[in-house]
């Protein structure tokens, strides 16, 4: 719980500064690049999470890996490293993106499907959800063969499970109690 509170304070402060300086889009892009690097390159995450590594080494690495980042993003990352708060970075990135979507009247919807969604179906789901919520929908789609068929949709903290896996589970529970 404490980590979420800390991450919220940093994300809010950065978002307000970014709005003030007109750098929201630039910082958002920087965070997308950084998030991708953390997810796809385990060494980046290991370095950031390593409490033994001195801050100067972490800052030097970040500067070498991301020389084109906005100066505000660079300063923010250096501040996090100096304050030993870099472990909160994934949460800060997610909260910053959430604030940006909120400001733009957008909503992130996570869709999990047994197979890859074809273009028309993906567009149809997005359109329906947009009409239901009254917001522009951004979809994060991933495949999960364990679902067997159907989809699972996560909108905020609600989950709509239309998967065959869930239907079989419910059938099993109704039979065996």
Curated annotation (Swiss-Prot):
Family: Belongs to the ATPase delta chain family.
Subunit: F-type ATPases have 2 components, F(1) - the catalytic core - and F(0) - the membrane proton channel. F(1) has five subunits: alpha(3), beta(3), gamma(1), delta(1), epsilon(1). F(0) has three main subunits: a(1), b(2) and c(10-14). The alpha and beta chains form an alternating ring which encloses part of the gamma chain. F(1) is attached to F(0) by a central stalk formed by the gamma and epsilon chains, while a peripheral stalk is formed by the delta and b chains.
Gene Ontology cellular-component terms listed: plasma membrane; proton-transporting ATP synthase complex
InterPro entries, per the entry: ATP_synth_OSCP/delta_N_sf (IPR026015), ATPase_OSCP/d_CS (IPR020781), ATPase_OSCP/dsu (IPR000711)
Gene3D superfamilies to which the protein is assigned, alphabetical: N-terminal domain of the delta subunit of the F1F0-ATP synthase (1.10.520.20)
Membrane topology of the entry: Peripheral membrane protein
Record localization: Cell membrane
Keyword Metal-binding assigned: no
Protein name: ATP synthase subunit delta
UniProt-recorded Gene Ontology molecular function terms: proton-transporting ATP synthase activity, rotational mechanism
Keywords of the record: ATP synthesis, Cell membrane, CF(1), Hydrogen ion transport, Ion transport, Membrane, Transport
A Pfam family the protein falls into: OSCP
Purpose of the protein: F(1)F(0) ATP synthase produces ATP from ADP in the presence of a proton or sodium gradient. F-type ATPases consist of two structural domains, F(1) containing the extramembraneous catalytic core and F(0) containing the membrane proton channel, linked together by a central stalk and a peripheral stalk. During catalysis, ATP synthesis in the catalytic domain of F(1) is coupled via a rotary mechanism of the central stalk subunits to proton translocation. This protein is part of the stalk that links CF(0) to CF(1). It either transmits conformational changes from CF(0) to CF(1) or is implicated in proton conduction.
Protein's organism: Carboxydothermus hydrogenoformans (strain ATCC BAA-161 / DSM 6008 / Z-2901)
């Amino acid at each position: 719980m404490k980590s979420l509170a800390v991450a919220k304070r940093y994300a809010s402060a950065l978002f307000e500064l970014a709005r003030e300086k007109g750098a929201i889009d630039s910082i958002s892009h920087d965070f997308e690049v950084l998030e991708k690097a953390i997810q796809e390159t385990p060494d980046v995450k290991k370095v950031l999470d390593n409490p033994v590594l001195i801050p100067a080494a972490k800052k030097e690495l970040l500067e070498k890996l991301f020389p084109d980042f906005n100066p505000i993003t660079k300063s923010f990352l250096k501040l996090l490293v100096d304050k030993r708060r870099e472990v909160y970075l994934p949460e800060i990135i997610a909260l910053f993106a959430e604030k940006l979507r909120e400001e733009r009247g957008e909503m992130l919807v996570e869709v999990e499907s047994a197979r890859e969604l074809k273009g028309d179906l993906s567009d149809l789901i997005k359109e329906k959800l947009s009409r239901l919520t009254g917001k522009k929908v951004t979809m994060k789609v991933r495949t999960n063969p364990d679902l067997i068929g159907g989809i699972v949709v996560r909108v905020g903290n609600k989950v709509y499970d239309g998967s065959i896996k869930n239907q079989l589970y419910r059938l099993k529970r109704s039979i065996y109690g």
